């Protein structure tokens, strides 16, 4: 297959980790992976407080367990998704089929855009619940830094995932253009629909000394009728 299809070279080449880590979409995946760890790690470790009066834990975001559950779920799933697509980035240059590369890039566009939307919803949801939280529920301000960190990195994750979607779309455009060129281009020498070129008699010196004319071999059988020849006895 042609080199450069959908942002990668020819299949079967040696794995180059240096080239991999320099790719913008790979860098954004690693950053998104780290952001997801911060979000779900902050909520799991310090997002639940102990109630002295009730004797049970409650979510730091306005005592709304759905807010904490959403943040943890999105963070964990985004963490796994980043690992999946990082593995795809490693394997992508080995994909020899242009159609398979196209499917991988299209899935990258859809998944990245979907996660950007989920992080936007998560940011708005956590920020709203944090804003309406009652100070009396947490008089000692326990876990407030972790709660703010989860909100902040949810906001940052919107742009890292949106950036991945944009980069994947650019790779799709490059791949679509190269695939269109490879399908439309045809070597004229391989085109069977073109008429044969007329024969042109060479005008240069004749290396065989034939004088540029066709000569019948001496031993060729003569098919023309011959007259009767008398034979002497």
Curated annotation (Swiss-Prot):
Organism expressing this protein natively: Homo sapiens
What is known about what this protein does? May play a role in regulated exocytosis. Modulates the localization of synaptophysin/SYP into synaptic-like microvesicles and may therefore play a role in synaptic-like microvesicle formation and/or maturation. Involved in the regulation of short-term and long-term synaptic plasticity.
The superkingdom of the source organism is: Eukaryota
Gene Ontology biological process:
cellular response to leukemia inhibitory factor; protein targeting; regulated exocytosis; regulation of long-term neuronal synaptic plasticity; regulation of short-term neuronal synaptic plasticity; synaptic vesicle membrane organization
Residue positions, PTM N-acetylmethionine: 1
Pfam families attached here?
MARVEL (PF01284)
Q: What is its main location?
A: membrane
Q: Domain MARVEL: where? A: 20-173
Q: Which InterPro entries match?
A: Marvel, Synaptogyrin
What family does this belong to? Belongs to the synaptogyrin family.
Q: Where is the signal peptide?
A: none
Q: Where in the cell is it found?
A: Cytoplasmic vesicle, Secretory vesicle, Synaptic vesicle membrane; Melanosome
Q: Where is the composition biased (Polar residues)?
A: 213-233
- In this chain, the stretch annotated as Disordered covers 194-233
Q: Which residues are on the Lumenal side of the membrane? A: 45-71, 125-148
Q: Which residues lie on this side of the membrane: Cytoplasmic?
A: 1-23, 93-103, 170-233
Transmembrane ranges?
A: 24-44, 72-92, 104-124, 149-169
Sorted alphabetically, the keyword list is: Acetylation, Cytoplasmic vesicle, Membrane, Synapse, Transmembrane, Transmembrane helix
Q: What is this protein called?
A: Synaptogyrin-1
Q: What is the lineage of its organism?
A: Eukaryota, Metazoa, Chordata, Craniata, Vertebrata
* GO (cellular component) term, any one: melanosome
Query: Topologically, how does it sit relative to the membrane?
Result: Multi-pass membrane protein
């Amino acid at each position: 297959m042609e080199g450069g299809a959908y942002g990668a070279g020819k299949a079967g080449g040696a794995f180059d980790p240096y080239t991999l880590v320099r790719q913008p979409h790979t860098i954004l995946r690693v950053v998104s992976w780290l952001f997801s760890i911060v979000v779900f790690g902050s909520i799991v470790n310090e997002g639940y407080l102990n109630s002295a009066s009730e004797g049970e834990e409650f979510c730091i975001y306005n005592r709304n367990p759905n807010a904490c559950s959403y943040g943890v779920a999105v963070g964990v799933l985004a963490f796994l998704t980043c690992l999946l697509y990082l593995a795809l980035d490693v394997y992508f240059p080995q994909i020899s089929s242009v159609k398979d590369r196209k499917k991988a890039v299209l899935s990258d566009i859809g998944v990245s855009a979907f996660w950007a939307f989920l992080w936007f919803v998560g940011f708005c949801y956590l920020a709203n619940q944090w804003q309406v939280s009652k100070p009396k529920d947490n008089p000692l301000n326990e876990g407030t830094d972790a709660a703010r960190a989860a909100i902040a990195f949810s906001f940052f994750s919107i742009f890292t995932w949106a950036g991945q979607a944009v980069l994947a779309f650019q790779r799709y455009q490059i791949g679509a253009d190269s695939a269109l060129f490879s399908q439309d281009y045809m070597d004229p020498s391989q085109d069977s629909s073109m008429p044969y070129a007329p024969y042109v008699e060479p005008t240069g010196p004749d290396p065989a000394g034939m004088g540029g004319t066709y000569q019948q071999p001496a031993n060729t059988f003569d098919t023309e009728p011959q007259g009767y020849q008398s034979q002497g006895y």
